[in-house]
Amino acid sequence: MVVMAQTKLCSDIEIPKEVYNKWKDFIKLVGNIILSIKQIPELEGKFKELLKKGRYNFKSDDFGGQLPEPFTRQKVIEPILEFLGYEFTSEISKKSPLGDRKIPDYRVSVFNKEILIEAEPLGSDLNKKDSGIHQVKEWLIIKSYGVDTGIATNGLEWVLLHYDDTIKEIRTLKELNLKSIFEYVLENKKDKDLENELKQVFSEFYYCFSKEYIEEYIEVATKNIKHKKEEITNEFYKEFVKLVFGFEDVKDVKKKDKSSSEKDKGTKKCLYNCIEAPPNTSELDKKKFAVLLMNRLIFIKFLEDKGIVPRDLLRRTYEDYKKSNVLINYYDAYLKPLFYEVLNTPEDERKENIRTNPYYKDIPYLNGGLFRSNNVPNELSFTIKDNEIIGEVINFLERYKFTLSTSEGSEEVELNPDILGYVYEKLINILAEKGQKGLGAYYTPDEITSYIAKNTIEPIVVERFKEIIKNWKINDINFSTLDEILNEDSKIAENKHILRAFLDELDKIRILDPAVGSGHFLISALKELLQIKKRIYYLLREEMDIYKEKLGIILNNLYGVDIDDIAVEIAKLRLWLALIENLDVEALKRGEVLLPNIEYNVRCGNSLVGWIDENLKQLSISYLCDNVRIMCVLEGLIINAHNSEERKKLKKAKELLEKRDGYVLDNYVEAYHLLYEVYRTSHGLKANLLKELLDEIRDSIYESVTPAYFAEIYQNGNNKKNNGKKSKKNRPRVEEFEKLKPFHWKIDFGWIIKEEGFDVIIGNPPYGNLLSPTEKEIMKRRDTPEFDIFVTFIVHSSKLLKNEGYLGFIIPSSFGTGVRYSNLRKELFTKMCLKKLIYLPFDVFSGAYVDNCIIILHKKPPKSEDLVLIYAFPKKTKKISFEFKNDLFIEYSKILNDPKCRIFPKSPEIYIILDKIKQNCRESLTYLEDLTESTIGILASKYKFSDKKENEYYLPYLEGNVYRYETKLKLKNYVDFSKHKNNEKLINLFMSPEKIFIRRIVNRQDRIMASYGNIEGVVKKDLYVFVLKPDTPINYFYLLGILNSELISYIYIGKSAIALKDDFRQTTLEELRELPIVIPKNKNIINALTQLSKLRFELNDKLNENDRIFLENIIDSLVYGIYFQDLIPKEELNEICNEINGIIKKYDEKSIDCLKYCQNIIKLLNTINTNELVRKIRNKN
């Protein structure tokens, strides 16, 4: 007997050994199925033909009078489904409420989820349109059944499909054919080697498709796909930066300062060093050219995948060049003509040698701006004479497969545009020579960009739909979610007029990413809107033109701004690639479709500095109608307009530019927008003329607006520092101001600002103290926070957001509870309605040492009864799932009731606990700051030290550390405290003979580390010092027991976003001071906790682990009893405390032994351990 070893499926997925034990039963099942087929004589021979050829076109007569599909379902598919463990009932009706849409043959349950199964007749093609795979994909995309997994089968072939809501695409996770197993049984083969091979086929089938394992397989398979992408991305990026810029890896870059990196670039052979640029070219422009060249080459690789350019174009042209005797370099001989004379030139304008070149003659004109010669100054004068380096670049690119579609589990190395976003986001930071930390930029994972896009766009869509329903005066339709609106069973599904109005309304939604980076958020927004449109077209029973709809979304809905022009180019590239994915290549070659001009949707500029709607009092405008060239070009464009609509827009623009009365600037902004609308779908000479026109108009407006805005900020802006007085001190010149790259929203997106702003603003703004001194001064004069750039982005974006609009950012978690953000939270959360705040796991961003959260805001005043979702992922969560239970929502009043409007991570439990304490302990509740004076230790590097006490101001300096109930501090030397000689309060705190120390770091068990100290001296900054105020009704050991208790640690961790940090979880002095301290009136209880706490402290070095746990359990239980007075009756608690006080006569081990046998203590522990609230705190429920 041959024993099958445990094998791996693919991508290191191991199949459980138990699966192989089912082989014999499956063979028996297959035999029974074949017997049922043999019972129909006319079918048997044709079934053998099917197994031989793999496909056979059966007719109805072949099934002995039965229809092919019902026979296949009853005799083949259903027995196999039963074997796979599914319970099912066949659907009676094959029509949906829409009348002509199929519904699934089976809907089977897998635990709490459903899987759709579409059955097709034996021998049928599962890839045929409107059946099989196509049908399952349609169901998954439209979400009619609320499921994300489906199976298509014809009995022999089985295909597992899974919808990934993050990328809004369907993955084929497994395709498997049972033909060889049926053939093996039918022919009664006895080949052991063949049997072992077929056992492997069966094991894969059972593991991937059975009820027992399908969920496990889907989870592992999707995880492996993600892991494989990450590996490919990292490999590609490492090679990329080495080849293009000479850096070995990212860590190498981060270690180098500017001078050393420039030195390396001069010695290492890389693309950057081989670029020959025209005289006076800046280093930045040279870098931009290197990136632009790589953009173009990668873009061409994607064009190869789409069939727009010949396969292996770069490799073949390079090989031909090496064989030829061409005197000029490869870049000038092949790449320059390809970029500028082919891809950027319409076919009828190309030179004869280009039209007849075998490589270029069939390549269509693309348009779109990527291949224009004005992306870098003097771009046509750049060259690369080193052919070898270009060959290395081409060989590097040829090692990868570039695909515009999502990988479906192929083992081949593939790169798609989403992966390139990751590569380029890291590249942007290197090019800026600040590193990621300097720019505060990191690539945001798909699941986060998708979640933010979905949860900001969908609410707007729902609100817009409500307006449509209201306009149609339909009152009997109730809905609150998009799924309810787009459900096949809803009344809306039957009304095509409303659905078309809905489509039109979607085109009006304006979405902005003000820190666009590589365009990742815009791509997620594109996918979200496209998904909604797919569902509407499904209800309309119409085929959607995906290219047309993507084009409309990119031109009408999506806008971005970034201060880095390289980032802007990459963002545009990604949008073009998303569009090309669905491009009709034949239509492109016929000249019927072209790439749009999108450079005016995604702009370069400083999002934080520029005119929005301020009243510019010193504006002096130049009349554009005096510019003869502009007027002449416009006249020519009007004469040669493509159609009447275009002519109408051009005429209107000319009229607006000719006006000298009224508010001239508004007229110019409107004219600018009209010309852009014509430009974005223009090409060739007309596109070039329009672009020149647009740039000239924009430059002219900027020349007027920038000085006026500058004057408004520095003369009329708020200046609290000088009590509102005008001051020229530290005021920059307007030329310096222009270097900030001001972006005037009222000009570039004036038509949107005129409509009150953007509907949705999303993104991952940079974080940190990154604003320049000039920028900080501007923010101060605009009453905008400037201490962290992400805060500035939030405030500024709220001004750009339309009323009722949504804002979704990923920002540092410290915003949720940090003291420095208190004023901003109060202002934001009272003017805007917080919808969601989600604390993310550690290490969401590769290489980023900051914890993050997602914030979703709705620009409307909140109501007390509004609900807010607050959730904190466990910090080491590897797989993020954004499926939240309803009980995680809290009422808005709980946020507003907190004086600092903090968002406590452990919600809603922490709010429940704090409310319970306030209600139960009104008279006995106080706070740590009311009972103590406190301070933080010193930063040693800022002080002088001596081995002896030089004078009265040299205080003892203590070295060591503090743990729970353990103080390991000793005198090291003396610290010069003379700078604080007038701060008697601070000196007294450090020199107090008694105190409590608390470590700044929270331990790995999420417990505060506090201990008692009867030692005088100054301590380091890692320790906090607390000294009881005079006449405080408690003692140090009672307070120590409270601070070290399980409950207080839970409250602290639950309230503090800073304490959630995974690497070094921290406390802050401000947050510690707010800890609730309950002081019972019953002295007996105070004495009992004091005795227990002192016993734990005194015996620290003598206790074994079990005794330590036992003693701390009693302390924790007693604290629960003190804080939750309904847990234990007062009399019973008093009796327990009496016994404790009676038992602890001495602080020795005997006291602990006596406590163990005390029945009341055992009862106390049992009561606390079984309490539901306590179990939640301990995560045991």
Swiss-Prot record:
Keyword Nuclease listed: yes
Keywords: DNA-binding, Endonuclease, Hydrolase, Methyltransferase, Multifunctional enzyme, Nuclease, Plasmid, Restriction system, S-adenosyl-L-methionine, Transferase
EC number: 3.1.21.4, 2.1.1.72
Pfam families noted in UniProt: Eco57I (PF07669), MmeI_hel (PF20465), N6_Mtase (PF02384), TaqI_C (PF12950)
Reactions it catalyzes: Endonucleolytic cleavage of DNA to give specific double-stranded fragments with terminal 5'-phosphates; a 2'-deoxyadenosine in DNA + S-adenosyl-L-methionine = an N(6)-methyl-2'-deoxyadenosine in DNA + S-adenosyl-L-homocysteine + H(+)
PROSITE patterns linked: N6_MTASE (PS00092)
GO MF assignments: DNA binding; endonuclease activity; N-methyltransferase activity; site-specific DNA-methyltransferase (adenine-specific) activity
GO BP, sorted A to Z: DNA restriction-modification system; methylation
Keyword Cytoplasm among UniProt keywords: no
Family: In the C-terminal section; belongs to the N(4)/N(6)-methyltransferase family.
Biological role stated in the UniProt entry: Probably a G subtype restriction enzyme that recognizes an undetermined sequence and cleaves at an undetermined site. Probably also acts as an alpha subtype methylase, presumably on the same sequence.
Protein's name in the database: Putative type II restriction enzyme and methyltransferase RM.MjaORFECS2P
